Amino acid sequence: MQLTRCCFVFLVQGSLYLVICGQDDGPPGSEDPEHDDHEGQPRPRVPRKRGHISPKSRPLANSTLLGLLAPPGEVWGVLGQPPNRPKQSPLPSTKVKKIFGWGDFYSNIKTVALNLLVTGKIVDHGNGTFSVHFRHNATGQGNISISLVPPSKAVEFHQEQQIFIEAKASKIFNCRMEWEKVERGRRTSLCTHDPAKICSRDHAQSSATWSCSQPFKVVCVYIAFYSTDYRLVQKVCPDYNYHSDTPYYPSG
């Protein structure tokens, strides 16, 4: 009895293994002449042949195997050919622009009764809001008002009572006090009128942060100082055209 010739092909890790099975020897007493001729010779063992798939046939074989192991949508992703995906748009840049810093805005007032230094900083957050920071250092006595005003605000002297009213009226510009800190004490120094004597003066340090939003596009700092022997009104506006992508044209 003879067994038919068989051939098995299977794929392991991208390589093709080919196993060929020859005819089995028949039972003793077989009358096959070919069997009699080769009876005295040992039957050669067919070696197991291993070969690689040709580049043309590899994608087909790989896709057949991967189709059984992975979902249809992931076949080409495993083969190194990812499917087309929509390109993600880059995130919008949220760069913070410093309109002017501590060294760009300051007001220094020195009188017989008062020594005052005010510094400020404005930061544009790029999302329609900006912050205004103030630092105040004063020795002596005097009344000072710091307000946020539009560029059209006229620089003029007012009565002392109107200064604080204007400071409260700045709320109409969508600005609010976000943080404030005040420290008070006494400081001794040489008397101004008589350097041979030592005088004690009131000393105050304060910091404040205001948060503003649109439509308050351009902000100016308005300082008004009144004392018995000195008066000062000052308006400081940043160079908005230098820091902004769109030009600003003031009106009024």
Curated annotation (Swiss-Prot):
Residues 27-59 are annotated as: Disordered. Highest level in brain, present also in lung, kidney and testis. May be proteolytically processed at the boundary between the N-terminal non-conserved and the central conserved domain in neuron-like cells. Residues 45-55 have a biased composition (Basic residues). Residues 1-22 form the signal peptide. Glycans are attached at residues 62, 127, 137, 143. The keyword Glycoprotein applies. GO terms for cellular component: extracellular region. May be signaling molecules that resemble neuropeptides. Ligand for alpha-neurexins. Belongs to the neurexophilin family. This is Neurexophilin-3.
